[in-house]
Amino acid sequence: MLGYILWTSLYVLLIVIPLILVVAYYTYAERKVIGYMQDRIGPNRVGSFGLLQPIFDALKLFLKEIIVPTNSNRYLFFIAPILAFAPAYAAWAVIPFSKGVVLSDMNLGLLYILAMTSFSIYGIVIAGWASNSKYSLFGALRAGAQVISYELAMGFAIVGVVIAAGSMGITGIIEAQSGGIWHWYFISLFPLFIVYFIAGIAETNRAPFDVVEGESEIVAGHHIEYTGSRFALFFLAEYANMILISILTSIMFLGGWNSPFQATALESIFGFVPGVVWLFAKTGIFMFMFLWVRATYPRYRYDQIMRLGWKIFIPLTFVWVVIVACMVRLGVGPWW
């Protein structure tokens, strides 16, 4: 029993610590990439090429004074960042990085992840209410409505994948896509693939769906009153969710750790590449897409975001799920 606890604790640390480092340097990559897209250099002063910038940013945040608004609900004000941070990292417990390399290989892994990603909204809403600020509350209300709207579309997209794969376990979904790139679901479930990733951008409150913290309207939304380490927790949760959406998109639609050269003449050449390398390469593509979209599109109005979710994404995914269910039931379609 003690050995199991120690092993589990070690595995958790092996996931959380590298993930926090990836989050830190993801912020650096974001500033660099968007800087180049805008014909700027980006951070280049702290360390060679600015590589130490994330470390000093973290030190700055964690050494700052924690200011609590006078009329805020002190206890909920402190709990809210933890409620946002914990689910964002707990969801990684069921993510398989390669065959057998997973903390908990659950049969209902996708359901667990959906629950964890939905639970993080409580931290945002509580932060907005407990801060006793109208701007924080407006941001929290927007976040609640936005997450509910796009969670439904994401849920339908996941249902389509589950029907096609015949499994709610993440490992089962990856194995169902083995056999080469033509077996990956981004081809047969292309509308669900597009909707899932765009809904993931909206769910993480990233541009162009960042009305939750629209600087020109409500200053900084739900974390306007947060400073220091409490603000850092929200920051870490947001970027961890971005990476989670990226890796889930890779797993559900791009075959996870499966090589794109399976069942081809190139399989013998690339057969030595570990599955985790393919998974991280695919994840990196979607992480870059988050940054590219932010640098390209202006912020949508709130009514446009709601219309996109309720009038386009939800009906589209619902209809496609029905089509997929009928095709699977009748034995028709590209599920080899």
From Swiss-Prot:
Its EC number is 7.1.1.-. The keyword Lipid biosynthesis does not apply. One of its GO terms (cellular component) is plasma membrane. Keywords: Cell inner membrane, Cell membrane, Membrane, NAD, Quinone, Translocase, Transmembrane, Transmembrane helix, Ubiquinone. It catalyses: a quinone + NADH + 5 H(+)(in) = a quinol + NAD(+) + 4 H(+)(out). InterPro entries: NADH_UbQ_OxRdtase_su1/FPO, NADH_UbQ_OxRdtase_su1_CS. This is NADH-quinone oxidoreductase subunit H. It comes from Francisella tularensis subsp. mediasiatica (strain FSC147). The gene is nuoH.
